[in-house]
């Protein structure tokens, strides 16, 4: 008989893992929590070793905390490459976007990929412009999908014994809607996704408002992926 196991006790990342309930409340795309959680991976040069850790908001946003920690603990030659992957429960605000760009400009050997569970105050034009500026400066920003949730569950979560495969499987529709809105942001289109908080809890509901400019600019397969658009629509 094989025993059920959680993360190995010999796993050097175990002390940096978050609890399963934390992952669920932070990364559920339907939740509108104020706090932000960051799970991150760092890979140096040609090394195959990946260093993982996590962080949360303090008096500063978690992105700023990461930058301060990274720059204070690491000194490396500009010729050494470093790839960083973030899994954020909220996308960066405009001020954090600016701080990230400054950090990357001072460390040209660093590449950054950001996966986000939700878009932070995406109706705010400053936040939208901040994300566009990040993309234009070479940062990859994507909405977390099922594969990213599973990756985070396995590598960042102190899941219960036997629950490796029982990671939270959130409704794909929310991921697709956020991905659609992220396309609108990157393409400088008006917002199409409106989100409201349900009364007396954190869960949210959405309304989709598409204009002609959305149909004319966004690739049809992205619109159809939401399942809310009829394929007989004339796109262009």
Swiss-Prot record:
It comes from the Eukaryota. It catalyses: a cytidine in mRNA + H2O + H(+) = a uridine in mRNA + NH4(+); cytidine(6666) in apoB mRNA + H2O + H(+) = uridine(6666) in apoB mRNA + NH4(+). Residues 10-134 form the CMP/dCMP-type deaminase domain. Disulfide bonds: none annotated. GO terms for biological process: cytidine to uridine editing; mRNA processing; positive regulation of gene expression via chromosomal CpG island demethylation. One of its GO terms (cellular component) is nucleus. Keywords: Cytoplasm, Hydrolase, Metal-binding, mRNA processing, Nucleus, Zinc. Its EC number is 3.5.4.-, 3.5.4.36. Homodimer. Interacts with A1CF; form an mRNA editing complex. Interacts with RBM47; form an mRNA editing complex. Found in a complex with CELF2/CUGBP2 and A1CF. Interacts with HNRPAB. Interacts with SYNCRIP. This is C->U-editing enzyme APOBEC-1. It comes from Pongo pygmaeus (Bornean orangutan). The lineage of its organism: Eukaryota, Metazoa, Chordata, Craniata, Vertebrata. The gene is APOBEC1.
